[in-house]
Amino acid sequence: MRQVLVYPGEDDYWVAECPSLPGCVSQGKTREEALVNIKEAIEGYLVALETDHLPIPEEHFDALLVAV
């Protein structure tokens, strides 16, 4: 399981990224599409790491909300 950030991007697209996997970013026309796309991106990222015999990064982020 991986934490994913989803937020509105440019041109009415949604951006999704996985902070524990550097460079693992995707987008979609809707929030739901962005989530589907980032899931595929994460799966591909992990397969590439395994294929290249590279270590799979641990999930190491805490999500916090800060009142300002």
Question: How should these model regions be labeled?
Answer:
Residues 1-5, 32, 36-68:
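Short, charged, surface-exposed hinge/linker loops at domain edges
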Residues 22-31:
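A short, exposed loop/beta-hairpin motif centered on an aromatic-Gly-Thr core
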Residues 6-21:
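Short aromatic-glycine-(Arg/Gly/Cys) micro-motifs in beta-strand/loop hairpins
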